[in-house]
Amino acid sequence: MEGIKFNQIGVSFKGSGSYVPDQILTNETISQKVDTSDEWIKSRTGISERRISGLGDNVNDMAYEAALSAIEMTNWDIKTIDLIVLATSTPHDLFGSAPSIQAKLGAHNAVAFDLTAACSGFLFALITASQFLKGGSFKRAIVIGADQLSSFVDWNDRRSCILFGDGAGALAIEATNEFDNFLGFDMRTDGERGSFLNLPSKNNKDLIIDNIDFLNGGFSPIQMNGQEVYKFAVREVPIILDNLFRKTNYTSDEVDWLILHQANQRILDSVGDRLKIPREKILSNLAKYGNTSAATIPLVMDEAIRNNRIKQNDIIATSGFGAGLSWGAALIKWG
């Protein structure tokens, strides 16, 4: 599916927010649990530490804090927000977490729903919300990416337990008739490679009455083929971004910032090199937070905005990629 340019209504980016739990899990602490080391983890992933949810944390609370922070950057009356899209693979309520966030915010006029696309989730949610705004259905939207993957990690598997952290990020976007800062997008899925990274269901069979079986649902820990995911990312992400540049009549030289899903520093560097984007234009906070799935892109963006790195009218190329396998790209102008 490819993006279509709408001339009548455009999208403006008005605010950003993020939240991470207080609890820090360092590489040194992990090395006390599994056979690894700080040097080994950093050399292969770029991660030094990650934030992990405690007993008092959940996805709803993290998403709420990120959304509230984004709203506070705007001058909006919360009652004027009419759309909330939450990207998450780890909802606090399996039937949907977005309505709880809507209620806690007091955004009673907003339609609220979850969207699941794993590490591509925030980008897919941003594209979805932007198309709703461009179509005239809604005027103000909060797009959130939040995940708590620490709850689904096998902490005895050193290949995966070193990667993931918890957190949330959000953007506030608004429909406008004056300009369009959502410059273009592209989205892809390849379900045939889905087994490279998944979190499959796990059913426990119980006999309840005579010969009637009851399946008590649950999930297995995250399963990942790291080598295949790496090869997928460094091949497909540069291709989709290069295609997007051609569609939007931009070049990589015109990009002020490249924000990729924070999966692995080697992936970030490789994609930048293939696109000939200098390392100083590649934003990363992977070392501090690890892979927070749907939260990574808005976490990086909010940090850069609040540190005055991203400025008004900066051109940002962004790409999310991961389980599904799914991947996508968007080109935006901040402001």
Swiss-Prot record:
The keyword Lipid metabolism applies. GO terms for biological process: fatty acid biosynthetic process. Gene3D superfamilies: 3.40.47.10. The active site is at C119, H261, N291. One of its GO terms (molecular function) is 3-oxoacyl-[acyl-carrier-protein] synthase activity. The keyword Acyltransferase applies. Its EC number is 2.3.1.180. Pathway: Lipid metabolism; fatty acid biosynthesis. Keywords: Acyltransferase, Cytoplasm, Fatty acid biosynthesis, Fatty acid metabolism, Lipid biosynthesis, Lipid metabolism, Multifunctional enzyme, Transferase. It comes from the Bacteria. GO terms for cellular component: cytoplasm. Its main location: cytoplasm. It is an enzyme of class 2 (transferase). Belongs to the thiolase-like superfamily. FabH family. The last Arg residue of the ACP-binding site is essential for the weak association between ACP/AcpP and FabH. HAMAP family: FabH (MF_01815). This is Beta-ketoacyl-[acyl-carrier-protein] synthase III. It comes from Prochlorococcus marinus (strain MIT 9312). The lineage of its organism: Bacteria, Bacillati, Cyanobacteriota, Cyanophyceae, Synechococcales.
